[in-house]
Amino acid sequence: MSPARPRWLSSLLLLPLALALLAPAPADAATRKAQKKPVASQARAKPAAKPAAKPAAKPAARPASKAEQLQRLYADYWEQSLQLNPLQATFQGDPRWNDQLPNYLSAEFRQRNRDFTAQWLAKVEAIGEDGLAGQDLLSYRIFVRNARDALESERYPAWMQPINQFNSPATLVAMLGSGSSAQPFKTVQDYDNWLRRAGQVPALFDQAVANMEQGMAAGVVQPRPLMEKVLPQLDALIRPTAEQTLFWNPITNLPAGFSEAERQRLTADYRRMIEGQLLPAYRRLRQFIAERYLPATRDSAGLGALPDGAHWYAFSARQSTTTDLTPEQIHQIGLDEVARIHAQIRKVMKQVKFRGSMQKFFRFMQEDKRFQFADEQALLAFHRGLEPKVMARAPELFSLLPRAGFEVRAVEPWRAQSAAGGSYMRPSGDGSRPGVFYVNSYDLPTRKTWDAEDLFLHEAIPGHHFQLALQQELEGLPAFRRYGGETAFTEGWGLYAESLGRDLGLYQDPYSYFGYLQNELWRTIRLVVDTGLHHKGWSRQQVIDYMLENSASSRTDAVAEAERYMAIPGQALAYKIGELKMQELRRKAQAALGPRFDPRDFHALVLKDGSVPLDVLEAKIDAWIAAAQAAD
């Protein structure tokens, strides 16, 4: 998993363009030479002096070009989008609205959001793309495409399903208030900001309940297994006293420089806020889900079972993959790729002299204790040890390296049961927070040594950390491109990065290489089961059975992944579709350029413009190949 921002945040905030965030570089100002005033000549005696010449009139200012007009629009759009979505600003390290929590689930906010998107789309389209070229044309087309997709998404009632085990305002608030996420707790002002923001949580939770009630009336409800997972998440956050909650962490870690008076005030204020506002809001939400919503949940698993669900899923698939592939086509691609990867796994079985069926080999890889970590610290230490090893070889494949810092952290216990095995949170825009690779140690025996190298390559280096950190550091791009992104590109790059393991000194034994094949297989299976769920009407159990029969996944992972696909329809398609396109483009470049092909040049070209739709990426690579051939 990854995200250009935390993936759940996009759906929670209903962002205007699914774009993201920081101020764009200002447009290059046209250089103008100042008009020199005439130099007065030395006085000379003359019968009559001529009147002094009038200063030459300044030339009229040059009208702004289309590109300059658009750059200003993007900058204004960005600033106003941060004001509309202060949580986005917080996650990007902009502290100006850290005390605000808009009721982003309300009908009023959704309408404001819709109007905002339509307004800025109209402004951009009024300028048009005629005469634009290069990055200016690319920015225009990405902005317009994403804005239109955002408006089209309003046709579908996602707001009636504000909570599942992946997307939840309850989880968002817990992350912010824990003291270890994007909400800063360094100054007295920071602490007061969270007090004010937390005071707005009850209204948000009550709105979530109201939305779910409307969903119950309309028949738009979550599958039961997803909401059963939400209850233990809430139970982990609800405690008898403030001191027993994770919301007390900022008080436990009060900075030493605070005065005694401030420490006492904040301690008292936080206790009142947690026990008087947060805990009652969490208890009301839990009671509603357990007593009223859970009995109304559905037995079906896929989006196709909901009103207009077939169109909803087709839109989700198109938006996720940035292609026009139909769910049926994607399903068949998945089946074909599963067969191809199975053939590669059989070669590994032969190499290690394993006798038996592929299913027996899968069980061996899951059950043999040699592939287990001793404890959580051993798991974390292994991943931390991969960074220097991979970075030592990275310059052989990459000429662009990010400046942002990076670290490995354990997934917090309260969300570990439903979290993926690994995930990435991008660094803050101001450099105050590094990129973070979260490693999950829940159900530790299922976290395999053969899986670790591949996971690191995908989530960390050279996967999401390289791509997302570099994207933020690109100069001259509008903010919506530096901090936004296409899932097919971002996750496609993560999966493509896994294929570089041997070149980076990893996959040195057949079992680790099997880990790479298994994870490629896992992402390929997603094409089959995601479309199976939402297009073909598969049940949750059918998805779990297919994954267990065709991969080395543990039952824990199979259940978690099946429920993930149920919660986020279409998102899982992006990985393999994006990776297939990147591998196709690399093969095309290698065939065309022969010995002149340099992976550093190819990777720089892929990454230097940030995340783009797959058709745009293909056009860019084709133009590069054509230019190289023309130079011969």
Q: What are the residue ranges of the model-derived segments?
A:
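Bacterial N-terminal signal peptides that target proteins for export
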Residues: M1-L13
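Bacterial N-terminal signal peptides
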Residues: S11-A23
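Sec/Tat signal peptide C-region and signal peptidase I cleavage site
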Residues: A25-A29
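N-terminal maturation segment of proteins
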Residues: A30-D632
